[in-house]
Amino acid sequence: ENPSWTLGILGMPGYTAYAGLLKIGEPKPGETVVVAAATGPVGATVGQIAKLKGCRVVGIAGGAKKCAHVVENLGFDACIDHRVDDMAAQLREACPSGIDIYFENVGGKVLYSVLPLLNPFARMPVCGMVAWYNLPGLQEGSDMGPAIMGTILRMKVKMQGFIIFDSFPPSLYQEFANDMMGWLKDGSVKYKEHMVEGLENAPEAFNQLLVGGNFGKVVVKVE
């Protein structure tokens, strides 16, 4: 009925969210989960699964419209606009008990705002670093490496990168597919696509993806 879903919620992005959160993040009821890029196909799915597991979920997205969608339509407890000047203060207020799981999709200032809030034995599945993908070289300013590694050491954080199709046993995909189909059918998980018409528009669609101009999973429709 929705063949494009095999590129999104029932494909690599959905599977990434499922495996990264459940197998690396290992969420427990009552924990606080923070999700970067919360309206993207991975982030949106991570947050909704975390809610199903009984967690408090705080999203981070770009712009008031995206943040409203995350709370009103996806059921997150809160969403912080990373474009505002006091993002770190707002994130701290939204996470009064600290952060137990941070699902990393972006890096940059979002990561730096999360670090001071990580609880002991927090888990950090590292899925992407989109804020740093197009850097021409090392950033100017303070080297944040010591702060990042110091927090990981001091707070005993489990930080694990993963590439979905070579980090988990093939049998996990069937488990994911069964669970996700059930959640989609009963409305527990909602899914949004950003459809672009025409192959000639694919390059611009990709550029918009890198700067957060998309709203949902970017799909190029070719007749």
Residue ranges and their predicted role:
Residues 1-223:
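Terminal helix/beta-alpha structural elements that buttress the NAD(P)+-binding lobe
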